[in-house]
Amino acid sequence: MWFYEKQLQYPVKIKNPNPKLAGIIISQLGGPDGEIGASMRYLHQRYSCPYDKVTGILTDVGSEELGHMEMIAAIIHQLTKNLTLEEIDGTPFAAYFVDHTTSAYPVAASGVPFDMKYVGVKGDILTDLNEDLAAEQKARTTYDNILRLSDDPDVNDVIKFLRAREIVHYQRFAERVQSG
């Protein structure tokens, strides 16, 4: 069903390592409003969806969220690549480093591992679409918060792209709710 292209949807080219920022952005990988949860939510909701057009949107957006997950992992990798222990020590990333070194393990910024309980799938299309609208808004808010905390233009460029895509996803789901 999927075709994998060996390039990201949007380029990730981080020049400066920053373990503190990596520890914040990790939340969009495995946090309650992150990309893994979004992709799992939409790709599982499609199985109980009675409308082909909505199933197509859930599949499209869920697939795109997998790509966003890859982009977040690339940001984390580039922010932590070749860090010294001195650069890590004393940052919030140090606790993460103990368990995962610099891998992209799905956790929230608080350190809580990803949990499928974040994924809302009820089997009622209106309930699920309203869950999706809320999920996209929460993801956008999280990206807004990251932008408030980040002073890295390379990171901010990618985060702004991802934030914009959350708005597009919200609009696509809203169109389906409004069309009945």
Language-model region placement:
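Non-heme di-metal
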Residues: 1-180
